[in-house]
């Protein structure tokens, strides 16, 4: 549980980059 909360509070850069690329690539 704490792990998920931490991930939401402070997402890792690797995950953020993946989301940014997906969002930018997805029209």
From Swiss-Prot:
Its cofactor is [8Fe-7S] cluster; [7Fe-Mo-9S-C-homocitryl] cluster. Its EC number is 1.18.6.1. One of its GO terms (molecular function) is ATP binding. Binds 1 [8Fe-7S] cluster per heterodimer. It comes from the Archaea. It catalyses: N2 + 8 reduced [2Fe-2S]-[ferredoxin] + 16 ATP + 16 H2O = H2 + 8 oxidized [2Fe-2S]-[ferredoxin] + 2 NH4(+) + 16 ADP + 16 phosphate + 6 H(+). The keyword Metal-binding applies. It is an enzyme of class 1 (oxidoreductase). Keywords: ATP-binding, Iron, Iron-sulfur, Metal-binding, Molybdenum, Nitrogen fixation, Nucleotide-binding, Oxidoreductase. One of its GO terms (biological process) is nitrogen fixation. This molybdenum-iron protein is part of the nitrogenase complex that catalyzes the key enzymatic reactions in nitrogen fixation. Belongs to the NifD/NifK/NifE/NifN family. Tetramer of two alpha and two beta chains. Forms complex with the iron protein (nitrogenase component 2). This is Nitrogenase molybdenum-iron protein alpha chain. The gene is nifD.
């Amino acid at each position: 549980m704490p792990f998920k909360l931490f991930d939401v509070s402070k997402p890792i850069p690797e995950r953020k980059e993946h989301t940014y690329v997906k969002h930018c690539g997805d029209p």
